[in-house]
Amino acid sequence: MSGSMYDDQYYATSRRHSLVTPPPSVAPRQNRMRSQSVRVSNGTVSTDNSMSSGRVSEATNITQPPAYSKKFVVVGDGGCGKTCLLISYSQGYFPEKYVPTVFENYITQTLHRRSGKTVELALWDTAGQEEYDRLRPLSYPETDLLFVCFAIDCPASLENVMDKWYPEVLHFCPTTPIILVGLKSDLRNKRTCIELLKTQGLTPVTPEQGQAVAGRMNASYVECSSKEMRGVDSVFQLAVDTVVSLEEQNWDTRLPSSSGKPGGKPIGGKKIKKRSCKIL
């Protein structure tokens, strides 16, 4: 079946079925390492010298070459705060002006806190608008982790997680780990936000509602405020811990030990290389 026919079938099916039941538990497959030269292209913003308030010394003092190279893709409704999340983390400031994203990549580095090793992150921003539905899957190949985002001040964006975003990423990246991220947490208790939603018979999304949806996705759940820089570092530290742990598990389970049986450490530093996201 050709790629175009396959995609047509998916989009036709996604309109009929708004909810997809998670598949049986499958250990996420580890992606292959990618060099920065492969990652960097036109439109990529390199942020190795990030001035993030929480990461200044870490980002500027990293001198060792990356031990890991990971790709994170961010999806969610347009205007829910995806770009602000990536810019706040990688560049250390909150963009006040909203400019819709088509595709944008950010390259930055951080430390895996347990091991102290350097991790290079390629952060892929995507467009949430419907007119880009057929272009967005181009971002998915070789993804190590997915951030599925919604805005806490917009209950409809959480509904769309199960109606649109989870089915889409499950289709294209069935074994890639997911973190559900509640954005704009600073608006939950803001009076103007509460009053505006009240006129529509709505309330801001509660932590319990976010946790419930994450449970249906078999995903981790975190919240943050990019504007206040609250919880942003925790979002990415959880992501880094997740993908590094998966790679270490792959070393233990997929490579032979000195006795020739599975379960050994990497031999000569070599790792099994696999892709977990692809366009069929």
UniProtKB/Swiss-Prot annotation:
Localization annotation: Cell membrane
Keyword GTP-binding: yes
Alphabetized GO MF terms: GTP binding; GTPase activity; protein kinase binding
Family the UniProt entry places it in: Belongs to the small GTPase superfamily. Rho family.
Region (Disordered): 13-59, 251-275
Keyword terms: Cell membrane, GTP-binding, Lipoprotein, Membrane, Methylation, Nucleotide-binding, Prenylation
Name this polypeptide is given: GTP-binding protein rhoC
Lipidation sites (S-geranylgeranyl cysteine): C277
Motif (Effector region): 98-106
Keyword GTP-binding attached: yes
PROSITE patterns to which the protein is assigned, alphabetical: RHO (PS51420)
Residues recorded with modification Cysteine methyl ester: C277
GO biological process, one term: actin filament organization
Topology in the lipid bilayer: Lipid-anchor
GO cellular component, one term: plasma membrane
Residues annotated as binding GTP: 76-83, 125-129, 183-186
NCBIfam families: small_GTP
Proregion residues excised on maturation: 278-280
Gene3D superfamilies: P-loop containing nucleotide triphosphate hydrolases
Composition bias, Polar residues: 33-59
